[in-house]
Structures are given as C-alpha cells and as structure tokens.
Amino acid sequence: MTSPRKTHPLKKMINNSFIDLPTPSNISFWWNLGSLLGACLIIQITTGLFLAMHYTPDTQTAFSSVAHITRDVNHGWTIRYMHANGASMFFTCLFLHIGRGLYYGSFLSRETWNIGTILLLTTMATAFMGYVLPWGQMSLWGATVITNLLSAIPYIGSNLVEWVWGGFSVDKATLTRFFTFHFVLPFIIAALATIHLLFLHETGSHNPSGMTSNPDKITFHPYYTIKDILGLILLLLLLMSLTLFMPDLLTDPDNYTLANPLSTPPHIKPEWYFLFAYAILRSIPNKLGGVLALVLSILVLMIIPTTHLSNQQSMTFRPITQIMFWMLTANLLTLTWIGGQPVEYPFIIIGQIASIMYFLIITTLIPLSALIENKLLKW
C-alpha cells in the first residue's frame, strides 16, 4: 500500500517539498540559509504577534507602551529583544543567502532570483516601518528623512509625501498606517517565500560545482533535515546570546529618548542592515540622484543574470571573478561602515568611491572577468 504522504493531497505537497525532494548530494552549509530565513520569519511573526497584543499605535502612548512591554509584561523584554535582534539575524541570513546565490550562480534560475529580489525589498520595507513603531527619536527622524525622499520625484513628489504621512508631518496617522503595514507585510513575505520555493523546486537546487546534479541526488529527509536543524540550533544560540547578554548591542541609544519633533538628533542613521544603502544615498549630492542610486543599489541584482557572460555557472573554478566577488564584499562592508559615520571629510570621499565601485564591480568588472576567463580557457 502506498504511504498516505504520497497520496494525500496536502501531505503530498509537504512530502514533495521537504521529505522526498531530490537534492544534490554535495550542497554545502551555504544552502542552509534558505531554511534559516524561514525560521527567522516564523520567529519574527510569532514574537511580533505577542508584541502587537500590548502595543498601541498612537503618538501619545506608543513609547510608553513599549516601555510597558519591557517592564510589566511577563517575559515582555525577552519577546521585544528577540524581535529586535531577530531582524538583525534575518538580514544577516538574507545577505549571506544573496552572497551564496551570487557566488554559485544560483541567479541563473531567473524567476527564483527575481522573486528573491522582491522579497528583499519587501523585507526592507517591513523592517523600516517596524523601526518607526517604538516612537523614539531615531524612529521619528528616520521616518521623516526616508519618507521625505519621495519629494524628489518630479511633479507629484510633495503631494506623495503628504499622502504617505497622512498630514503635513510624520504624526499619528503615519504611525497608525506604518503599524498596519508592518503587521500585514510579513504575511505577504510568507506568501512570496512560498512562490520562491515553488519556482526553486521547478528546477531544483544548484550545487557548488556548478555542474548538473541530476545523476547524483538524495532525498531531503533525513540528510538535509538534520543538517538544517544544526544550522537552526546555531542560529538560535546566536540570537539568544544577543537577546540575553547584549540586547542593545545593535540598537541606537537615541531610540530610548521619546520622539521630539523640535529636536533633531546629531546623526540620523538607520539600523546597521540599511547602512550600505544609506551610504550610497548620501554619497550623491543631488536628491533625485541619491534616491535613484538607493533604489538601484537593490534593483541592480535583477540584471545580474543578464550580465553573466561566463561559460561556467559557479565561481568555484574562476579565480579572477572570485577576486571581484571578495572586492564587492569588502566594498559593502566599507559602505556599511561609512553609513554610520558623520557627513564630513574623509568619510564623504570614501563613501563616493565605494558607491562607484559597488555599481562598477556588479555591472562591469564581474562580466569583464568572465570574458577574460573564457578567453584564457579558450572556450
């Protein structure tokens, strides 16, 4: 008799996605990140749900409701800090996941890659709106600065900003709508992640060698479920260490001051995971140019499948392109550092050089390296 997991309509879907899924036998730890992102999303939705039970999206009470969660709600501080540091874990896994996709040529599955880029944008939007909710100084001024960028759009800019704000400044209406979207978007992310998986399972996973793995596949369970559980344990270990020992390591002290529209913080900056994009935005003196560069810093990922000119899929056997990849990594770390620095010499010029290099490496140097390698291999 055939097992119910292979015949039952619902169990069959789960079976084909997580149990009997044919998986390359040689995929490394870097393929764990997808399941870790799923775990991060579940943690964020669960902790967020409990926080929403006690939070009030009102300018008069938002700050004190967060303080109430931290002080008076049973284990409220744990839930709050797990949610705040969970976002950092989420973005760490996201960046590593994208890096893996770039290095091993996973972007050649175009639908999966493009939906992944949309997922990144949606996650960034969700995290930005979540940062506004505690209604501290950095929440208010971060929201003001970033939403104000819409005013750079010709003709409709000013009207658009006031429409987003729900008034003439970031106020109660803005906070309420940001809370609404922050609550809804994670479920949209979950739906997009399901579509992401759907497209991935159409072609199957790639592997480190970049060659087809059809002749050599194994079932996902038990081999990769065990491997993923190990990754999950390490992730939870890191998250709980941050939450219990250093909960404020990655947050801004300014956000412990109640939002005051009459007092501007000395340095307005977003959370660490947005600093690279913020540095690109700041390094262009023109407002519209900065906004375009900011958007393109993410959307540039979508052109990578088109600029792939190598005859090999993966970078495993391509030393010149590997150098370019690690240059890009170092460049992103430089941009992250610059984003947190004040706008003064020498940080301005470093930021401008790093911003130019970011786009240059992705659009020109990596494709050029591929052509050189093709020539060297006489292909």
From Swiss-Prot:
It is a multi-pass membrane protein. GO terms for molecular function: metal ion binding; ubiquinol-cytochrome-c reductase activity. GO terms for biological process: mitochondrial electron transport, ubiquinol to cytochrome c. The keyword Zinc does not apply. It is found in: Mitochondrion inner membrane. Binds 2 heme b groups non-covalently. The chain crosses the membrane at residues 33-53, 77-98, 113-133, 178-198, 226-246, 288-308, 320-340, 347-367. Keywords: Electron transport, Heme, Iron, Membrane, Metal-binding, Mitochondrion, Mitochondrion inner membrane, Respiratory chain, Transmembrane, Transmembrane helix, Transport, Ubiquinone. Component of the ubiquinol-cytochrome c reductase complex (complex III or cytochrome b-c1 complex) that is part of the mitochondrial respiratory chain. The b-c1 complex mediates electron transfer from ubiquinol to cytochrome c. Contributes to the generation of a proton gradient across the mitochondrial membrane that is then used for ATP synthesis. This is Cytochrome b. The gene is MT-CYB.
